């Protein structure tokens, strides 16, 4: 693997170990030329996924792009990064298990919303404001009401 610091073509693996409950291999690498150390992750990719955007354009699924969009929603929130990584991995597994070669971007947005709802209400609202294209304050009010109703429904089930 190429060194990200000096671009030398050959680096050495110093340590390999399973991560994310065995779904990923984490490798620590070192460059023999500049001594730079870095980590890589190896994941199974079941199939190449294509994402159909709202405008009809297709593009390859990009896990990093998904991670960046979730990172924006959780920015400055006290959320364990491992929890976010697990959520992203779960979303990717769900997408791969659909068995469809093309997936609508709306489906991904829905899966992210469901994942964030279980992690952090503020991150959920932030993501929803972009995903649902909020135009005014009443859109925020509606999603907060939706969240509050969901919490009240959950609490009433525990009271029974």
From Swiss-Prot:
Q: Where is the ATP-cone domain?
A: 49-139
Required cofactor(s): Zn(2+)
Task: Quote the InterPro entries the UniProt record gives.
Answer: ATP-cone_dom, NrdR-like_N, RNR_NrdR-like
Q: Which UniProt keywords apply?
A: ATP-binding, DNA-binding, Metal-binding, Nucleotide-binding, Repressor, Transcription, Transcription regulation, Zinc, Zinc-finger
Q: How is the cofactor bound?
A: Binds 1 zinc ion.
Secretion signal: which residues? Answer: none
PROSITE patterns reported for this sequence: ATP_CONE
- Please provide the Gene Ontology terms (biological process) for this protein: negative regulation of DNA-templated transcription
The chain's coiled-coil residues are none
Entry annotated with the keyword DNA repair: no
Q: Which family does it belong to?
A: Belongs to the NrdR family.
Role played:
Negatively regulates transcription of bacterial ribonucleotide reductase nrd genes and operons by binding to NrdR-boxes.
PANTHER family membership: TRANSCRIPTIONAL REPRESSOR NRDR
- The protein, known as: Transcriptional repressor NrdR
Q: Which organism is it from?
A: Bartonella tribocorum (strain CIP 105476 / IBS 506)
């Amino acid at each position: 693997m190429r060194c990200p610091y000096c671009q030398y073509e050959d680096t050495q693996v110093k340590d390999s170990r399973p991560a994310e409950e065995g779904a990923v291999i984490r490798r620590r690498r070192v460059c023999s030329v500049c001594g730079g150390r870095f980590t890589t992750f190896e994941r199974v990719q079941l199939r190449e996924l294509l994402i159909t955007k709202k405008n009809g354009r297709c593009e390859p699924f990009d896990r990093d792009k998904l991670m960046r969009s979730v990172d924006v929603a959780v920015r400055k929130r006290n959320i364990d990064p491992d929890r976010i990584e697990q959520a992203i991995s779960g979303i990717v597994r769900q997408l791969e298990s659909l068995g469809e070669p093309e997936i609508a971007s709306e489906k991904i947005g829905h899966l992210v919303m469901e994942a964030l709802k279980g992690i952090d209400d503020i991150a959920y609202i932030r993501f929803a404001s972009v995903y649902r294209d909020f135009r005014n304050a009443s859109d925020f009010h509606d999603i907060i009401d939706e969240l509050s109703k969901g919490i009240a429904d959950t609490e009433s089930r525990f009271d029974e």
